[in-house]
UniProtKB/Swiss-Prot annotation:
Subcellular location: Cell membrane
The protein's name: UPF0756 membrane protein Dred_1676
Any one cellular-component term (Gene Ontology): plasma membrane
The keyword Membrane appears for this protein: yes
Main subcellular location of this protein, as a coarse class: membrane
Species in which this protein is naturally found: Desulforamulus reducens (strain ATCC BAA-1160 / DSM 100696 / MI-1)
PANTHER family: UPF0756 MEMBRANE PROTEIN YEAL
Length: 151
């Protein structure tokens, strides 16, 4: 078994132990792709996987607006209120951190394992909610940047 396959098996086990279905399913899918000799899909998944994931995430977020569970009036109130304004600022900061996290993962793809382990620890011990490695990478990039200020 190659190191990539072994890493996927370890991630599968971590996902199962931590009851993180996303990690377990992703590791399983990648193992199936590898073992079924459909590894020609890897470049496509690597290139477009993030876009597809964000597409489905955005679709799920916009459903309440599309189904009128959140009205235009609600949207206008939330944009003009202090919590709404702070949400906008939070969105700006989060997207910037995500961008930095994406750069970090492109520069050093091996960091993903640490991000997943950290996410699992957060789930198990801090009742955290996994939303994906991109934000974790953004926070890690911020920490690395702060550390670089002192070196």
């Amino acid at each position: 078994m190659y190191s990539g396959e072994m890493t996927m098996v370890i991630l599968l086990l971590i996902g199962l132990v931590a009851q993180s279905n996303l990690i377990a399913i992703c590791a399983s899918v990648l193992l199936i792709v590898q073992f079924s000799k459909m590894d020609f899909l890897f470049p496509y998944l690597e290139t477009h996987g993030l876009e597809l994931g964000l597409l489905f995430l955005l679709l799920s977020i916009l459903v309440p607006i599309a189904t009128d569970r959140v009205t235009t009036r609600d949207l206008l109130y939330n944009v003009s209120s202090l919590p709404g304004f702070l949400s906008i600022v939070g969105g700006i900061l989060a997207t910037h951190l995500n961008s930095e996290g994406l750069k970090l993962m492109q520069i050093d793809p091996s960091i993903i394992f640490g991000l997943i382990v950290g996410s699992v620890i957060g789930i198990i011990f801090f009742n955290g909610q996994p939303v994906g490695p991109l934000m974790a990478a953004g926070v890690a990039a911020l920490f690395i940047e702060v550390l670089n200020w002192f070196h």
